[in-house]
Amino acid sequence: MLSCTTSTMPGMICKNSDLEFDLLKPCFYPEEDDIYFGGHNSTPPGEDIWKKFELLPTPRLSPDSALAEHSLEPVNWATEMLLPEADLWSNPGEEEVFGQGGLRGCTSNPIILQDCMWSGFSNPGKPESVVSEKLPGGYRSLAVGAGTLAPGAAAAASSAGHERSGTAGVGRGKAAWLTELSHLDLECVDPAVVFFPANKREPMPVPTIPTSTGSAISLGDHQGLSSSLEDFLSNSGSVEEGGEEIYVVMLEETQFSKTVSRLPTAAHQENAALSPGCAQSSELILKRYDLIQEQHNYAAPPLPYVDREDARPQKKPRSHTSLALKCVFRPKAPRLGSRNNSDWENIERRRNHNRMERQRRDIMRSSFLNLRDLVPELVHNEKAAKVVILKKATEYIHTLQADESKLLVERKKLYERQQQLLQKIKQYALC
């Protein structure tokens, strides 16, 4: 397996195949043959990945004028980065290195080349021991010393070692070693330069939040504002609640909105009336707003029942105006944007039917009440049912009809008697 450095960065490959393996030999460890098979002592990939990058100094970002002295064909690494992928792999010198024949000819005792990015060490001291074995004796102490530095410090020290030999924490021996190895890393490229398109990104614009005072709060300031607000809220618990102005502030990270609700107290109003000038200069007091949730204790004994007369609901007196209000009906205006006119007609028809039905019931009820008042037996019976009212009214009508027929017969008899008397009077007048 080819290493990640050789497979993704063709600019780091030397044109001389004899120096290729010697340059990259310290990056491979033969003891890692079983690392991809999940050994018991193996660690997950990526734990000590940065530890390996600390072992060797990072090469310079770009070659200088010394490239022409050591190479007959100067390589412009920026041009190679801009060339298509097919042109990069079409170099015959690179094909020999990436080919199987080139790898077999590098050494008589080939080892399994593994990816340094995804291999791991179970022992933290293993990388230093392997590098000390691979490098010459004069460079072992320098390599181990460089490996113990931080990633940022090691990269800075190695890049600055080509220009300044008096860097803090680096001796003369390290400067001499870097000078000797300068001809080997002329064609090497920093990994950050290889991933230039991925790292070169424009910063995203930070949204701003307009406030009432005219200032804007950015996204970066929002996090600091929330943290400082929490500290201020935790420290404001000891403030007296007598003459303060409570502000409830709610911050939502998704909407970046701030809602402030003002809850003035009676004491604050009194203080404002006494000293109006001090109220303007006083700072806003932010107080934590906690929701009080009361839960019923089922284990507690029940409270004694207290019968209060004032707690009983009073019955509303029945008014006669309610009947008149029910009769008055104001039809609602049709809604704008109705789906169909037929639906509105059906609704209007139902409303008219209901209105007429209510009117009919009210008229019938009033008729029964009037009929009850006409029947002598039901005049004082206000709770008489409709059936009783109809029955008594029918009987009363029959009696009235019988009395009427009797009166008619009597009237007829009286009329006949009247006629007889008139004839007698005429006879006495002629005599």
UniProtKB/Swiss-Prot annotation:
Stored InterPro entries: bHLH_dom, HLH_DNA-bd_sf, Myc_transcription_factors, Tscrpt_reg_Myc, Tscrpt_reg_Myc_N
UniProt KW Nucleotidyltransferase keyword: no
Keyword Protease: no
Region (Leucine-zipper): 400-421
GO molecular function annotation: DNA binding; DNA-binding transcription factor activity; protein dimerization activity
PROSITE patterns membership: BHLH (PS50888)
Record GO cellular component, one term: nucleus
Modified residues (Phosphotyrosine): Y36
Signal peptide positions (record): none
Domain called bHLH: residue spans: 348-400
Compartments, record wording: Nucleus
Key words, A-Z: Apoptosis, DNA-binding, Nucleus, Phosphoprotein
Gene3D superfamilies with a match to the protein in the record: Helix-loop-helix DNA-binding domain
Transmembrane segments: none
Source domain of life: Eukaryota
GO biological process: apoptotic process
Assembly behavior: Efficient DNA binding requires dimerization with another bHLH protein.
Function: Has apoptosis-inducing activity.
Cited PANTHER family: MYC PROTO-ONCOGENE (PTHR45851)
Protein name: Protein S-Myc
